[in-house]
């Protein structure tokens, strides 16, 4: 079976791929398990040497890798360069720190020795999305290969070239054959094939970054077969703008968060909850800042906004905007599909949003900002927490003590930032709560998710 990828900026066909066959999947599962059994016995220094090499290769080949992202899913070159550097940083970070993170933790008891050891568990299936084709993979793969696990990647089919380039990086860095493997699977066949792979005894765990629907499917299947799973799902991140916020700081941060990657980011700001006394000024400044984002050719290094990754994504966002307007939202900016080739969508701003509306409660995966007003802080926090999502949140205020308290104790999310837009950092754990998933990636905590946290006692 074959499938073809499409350039979202030109609508031209790119590449045709042969789907990985059942026999090839069987071979990959066998070889992944064999590679794991050997790899786990190598020293941290041995593993780190190869991961450092990948970091070097990422930096060396950054323009070629960025070009692949630009033509496959529409990411502008400038944003692609940032993504590739972040991948190199996460490789360096785990190469430098994994031995420390995974060292035995001794606990004093009446025995001669009692300690916790962190051991690899085996091949891990990674089901990854298209929006950050390299970062989503490396933030998971880097810690897991340092832990000693092997990785089988099922990437989004519209970024198949990126997935092949990632696999080639592992080969060029002299990792063992099939320690990192890549499955090419068309969208319509993903549920059936994943349903066969997860129950397989050669798979020890599964991680997914994607929608809540996909996460529920994978988690239920993993749970049925008692496989460890980690899920990073969608978000409808709320940014709370208190009346004492510095709008010259807040607005650029808010717009950057919403517009990055054409709004196709799980941890993007999606709902702006603004004190009613400053709402008019915030809206005016937000619209002015949004107009700086002009859709264009992602291969042009000066373009700051590319197309959406697929036609169905463009149409879905547009339909959400139209329905929101029917529900009473006011269109302040954008909201029209441009008459041009490509799956472009303009910066769009909606106001007069009600808490029971679609745009408030659903994730909008595109460059659409929803602005909601409040008249007291308790109402703001209630609005921020009232959806099923809990990935990220931010608060803007000049009262740092208050901002810290609200971020720490009152906002329901896996990451809460004060006076800055939410972003992932290799040094900090990342993940969500509620319908935004469970488990953590990155940091010392992330590398332990797919470890056997083993208690060892010597009398």
Residue ranges and their predicted role:
Residues 15-20, 35-41, 126, 239-242, ...:
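Short, well-ordered beta-strand elements within core beta-sheets of diverse protein domains
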Residues 11, 47, 69, 91, ...:
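Residue-level signal for inorganic ion chemistry
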Residues 36, 40, 55-62, 66, ...:
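Structural signal for hydrophobic packing residues in well-ordered secondary-structure cores
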